[in-house]
C-alpha cells in the first residue's frame, strides 16, 4: 500500500548517513540531556529550553508557550506551497528508572519510559537536516516542527490543536519508537492504528461492620470483588468477538484494618475501543453490570466515567505515502504494513481528527523492554534513522 498522497519518486540516498555524520552527536547528546531531567505533563519548561538551545541558529520562525511549554518552529522553503507538520512529544512518566544507564534519570520517580526523549531529539535532527541550504531551497512550502508537552494523559495534543497549531497545515506525521518491532523497521497502517482510551472510577457502597459478624454488614470488599469479575463479561459476552475491546480494572482499594468490614471500596480502570458506537455504549454497560451486582448483594455502585483520547485514525493515502517514503529511504525489507492496531492510545489522534496524516512506528528491537517499563533502553543508532525519515516525509511532500 503506497497510496496516492504524493508521488514517491525522490531519491533519498545518503540522507541518513549525512544526518549521522553532521548531526548525530548533537542528536544523541540532546537525547541524553533530556533523559537525565525528565519532566511530566505540561511542566516541560527545562525540556523546552534544551530544544530551543538545540535549534538555535537555524532559519526557523519559533513560537514558544504553545500549550504552556510547547514549541512550534516553522521552516519556510524557497517556493510557495503547503505546510507539512512533524510532531514529537516531550513529557516523561512517573516511573523509577532501572536501566543503569550512565545518563539515567537524575529525578527520583521520573523517567523517559516511553521514548519521548528520542522522539524530541529525532525531530530536532530533522530540523537541522532540512535547514541545510540545499534541502531548504528544494522545499515548496513550509515545515512545522511541533514539540508537544503532556502526551501522557494530559491531552497536550488537543490543546495544541485548540490553539491553532494545525490551522494552516495540509498534512502531519509523527514517529513512535516501538519495542517488539525489529530494529529500524518502519510500520504503519491505514485506518485505526491506536485505540480510544477511556477511564472510570467506581465507588462501591455497602454497610460496615465487625469482621467476625459479616451477616450484619454488606461487605464492600466482597461486592467489589464480584463487580470486578462481572465486568469481564462486558467484553467477553457483549462485544462481537471480532471487534477489539479491552476493559481492565487496574486499581482496587478498601479498608482500614484487618478485622473491620469497610462500608466503601474503590475501583479504577480503563476501557479501550476502536469502534465509536461501541465506545459510546460502554459506560452504560459498565454501570448497569456494576450496579446490578452491587444491588443484588445489598449495596450500590456509583460510576464516574471519563472519555479521554479518541481513536488514532491514519489517513489511507498518508499511511501509504509514509510507507513509500520509508521504502525509498531504507529499502523494502525495512517496511511493514501492519495488520492490526495496538490497543494503546495516543493524543496524536486529535491532530488526525483535523488534518490528514499518519502515526508511524519505528522499531527499536524485539528484545527491548516494553514501553512504560523501568527497564526501557534503546540503541541510540535509531535516532539518525528517525530523523532521516521525518525529514524525508516533509522533503518529498514539498519537493
Residue ranges with predicted function:
Residues 71-72, 93-95, 99-111, 117-118, ...:
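Histidine/acidic-residue-rich, glycine-tolerant segments that coordinate divalent metal ions
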Residues 39, 43, 152, 302:
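Contiguous, non-catalytic segments that form substrate-binding/exosite surfaces or channel walls
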Residues 85-87, 200, 359-365:
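Non-cysteine beta-strand/loop elements that form the S-adenosyl-L-methionine
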Residues 34, 73, 86, 116, ...:
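Divalent metal-coordination and catalytic microenvironments
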Residues 28, 49-52, 124-131, 158, ...:
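Predominant activation on well-ordered alpha-helical scaffold segments within soluble catalytic domains
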Residues 2-9, 225-399:
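Metal-dependent amide/peptide-bond hydrolase catalytic core
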